[in-house]
Amino acid sequence: MTQQEMKKIAAQAALQFVKPDTIVGVGSGSTVNCFIDALASMKDQIKGAVAASKASEERLRAIGIEVFNANEVSELDVYIDGADEITPQGAMIKGGGAALTREKIVSSLAKKFVCIVDGSKQVDVLGTTFPLPVEVIPMARSYVARQLVALGGSPEYREGVVTDNGNVILDVHNFHIIEPLKMEHTINNIAGVVTNGIFAQRYANVTIVGTPEGAKIIE
């Protein structure tokens, strides 16, 4: 079974967490694209969605789902998104698609975060397989990079990428993130950092893993 097929299995299983007459929080990325496609079957049952990226917004509108601005809603029932890495405790690294800041905002509005992944994203310690993305205001890039080196990381500028907010991304290698919540706060306190891709303060309440045997739900 291909990775794409396992993503589709996880995405399909996430529909059970979507309640009728609610506004759904939707993340971004390849697994979320599978979820948006699956959500088309419920488009007449939900009020609409809040999207964490322009790409997701366009995909939702294309299938006829109304998209609301995050400022128009006070709370979301559920937020569905993927992850680049996720631990058994639900802490994640996200931001491979450079939408981490908006993902953090929309997920913070939700009562429940449902993370949909294939098995390759499961790790015991964050930073094992994937660098940590950090969104940075352009003028602070060099300063922030030096601070990340001081923390033990090896930052790499993601060439040619500008976020939906007009900022740049540093991908930090060689972090072995034993205390995700502490590291999330430490990096966010560096002047010029918008946010980083550790999702530990807003962790996943439910993880759905697509496997060849079907969807495995971890709560």
Swiss-Prot record:
Protein keywords: Isomerase
GO biological process, one term: pentose-phosphate shunt, non-oxidative branch
Catalyzed reactions per annotation: aldehydo-D-ribose 5-phosphate = D-ribulose 5-phosphate
One GO term describing the cellular component: cytosol
Pathway(s) annotated for this protein in UniProt: Carbohydrate degradation; pentose phosphate pathway; D-ribose 5-phosphate from D-ribulose 5-phosphate (non-oxidative stage): step 1/1
Single GO term (MF): ribose-5-phosphate isomerase activity
Enzyme class: isomerase
Active site positions: 103
PANTHER family on file: RIBOSE-5-PHOSPHATE ISOMERASE
Family statement: Belongs to the ribose 5-phosphate isomerase family.
Name recorded for this polypeptide: Ribose-5-phosphate isomerase A
Organism whose genome encodes this protein: Actinobacillus pleuropneumoniae serotype 5b (strain L20)
Species classification: Bacteria, Pseudomonadati, Pseudomonadota, Gammaproteobacteria, Pasteurellales
Designated gene of the protein: rpiA
